[in-house]
Amino acid sequence: MTKRLRAEDDFNPVYPYGYARNQNIPFLTPPFVSSNGFQNFPPGVLSLKLADPITINNQNVSLKVGGGLTLQEETGKLTVNTEPPLHLTNNKLGIALDAPFDVIDNKLTLLAGHGLSIITKETSTLPGLVNTLVVLTGKGIGTDLSNNGGNICVRVGEGGGLSFNDNGDLVAFNKKEDKRTLWTTPDTSPNCRIDQDKDSKLSLVLTKCGSQILANVSLIVVAGRYKIINNNTNPALKGFTIKLLFDKNGVLMESSNLGKSYWNFRNQNSIMSTAYEKAIGFMPNLVAYPKPTTGSKKYARDIVYGNIYLGGKPHQPVTIKTTFNQETGCEYSITFDFSWAKTYVNVEFETTSFTFSYIAQE
């Protein structure tokens, strides 16, 4: 014997199914429509399922229109608002292009002509320059080793005589940065030590003339036992030596008789405020004037002799002997030996100038 399935006590065989008898359902239309896009809401009412940007406006199905879109009243078409360089052509949104812009491989790009290039990781690894437009430079213009903040630099060769003046012009001679001249300035303030600190003013000018150095030297003693020469009271006082010692870069060493802070490249009638770091081109040539070694031959060309005169008087001569690279504890050296044979009585030591030249290291 089989049993029949018993219906629920509240089962209602009349459409709509599943609703309690006390619900207010104004219509009893059977659900002969698809639920895709439709809904039974409110209960008993067939309505549309809406998702943005579809909406109901004034009982009409409408479209929510945001910025950049417009619904044309005449045609009822939805259009895009454009401003140049954007435009509509053949119902397509495009961009108006003019040189040097173009579209290549569906990408907006820049047409770079001669002298211009867009840096990629394959061409340079400089930080900040990848994917940027740069100016291609040849020899002497710019550098691939540093990023100069977008500026194009002109490289000036060291020791070549070229520099930039205050106006940014490239000049062969710059009076404010004359790197062709190393000197002590023309003033008479003491800068040298003979037997005590700052007892004399050594005036020395070295000017580079190609492979030679043109030099001019003079001396004024302002203090100490050499200020006034009196060989009657001090007959042994017949000479002294001033040494200029330089390191491998041509920088004056502290152990020199000349004060280091008084020696630099020329800046008008003074010296540059920043100490120089290299001046090998002004140094005596090590082949022409070799350092003394055991058994090495000493040549007469290693010495320059001359006469200077105390007080500018021809009857008061002093011999000046200049030698090159003869000192120890340095890479290069210039040595001045001052001596006299006459007996001077109460003569002030103030000399005339002496000009000489020597072969430069570079």
Curated annotation (Swiss-Prot):
GO BP field: cell adhesion; symbiont entry into host cell; virion attachment to host cell
Cellular compartments annotated: Virion; Host nucleus
A UniProt-annotated Pfam family: Adeno_knob
Cysteines paired by S-S bonds: none
Entries under Gene3D superfamilies matching the protein: 6.20.10.20, Adenovirus pIV-related, attachment domain
Primary site of residence: virion
Top-level taxonomic group: Viruses
Record remark on domains: The tail region anchors the fiber to penton base capsomers, whereas the shaft, built from several repeated motifs, allows the knob to protrude from the virion.
Additional comment: All late proteins expressed from the major late promoter are produced by alternative splicing and alternative polyadenylation of the same gene giving rise to non-overlapping ORFs. A leader sequence is present in the N-terminus of all these mRNAs and is recognized by the viral shutoff protein to provide expression although conventional translation via ribosome scanning from the cap has been shut off in the host cell.
Summary of subunit composition and partner proteins: Homotrimer. Interacts with host sialic acid. Interacts (via N-terminal tail region) with pentons.
The protein's role, per its UniProt record: Forms spikes that protrude from each vertex of the icosahedral capsid. Interacts with host sialic acid to provide virion initial attachment to target cell. Fiber proteins are shed during virus entry, when virus is still at the cell surface.
Protein family per UniProt: Belongs to the adenoviridae fiber family.
Name of the protein this chain belongs to: Fiber protein
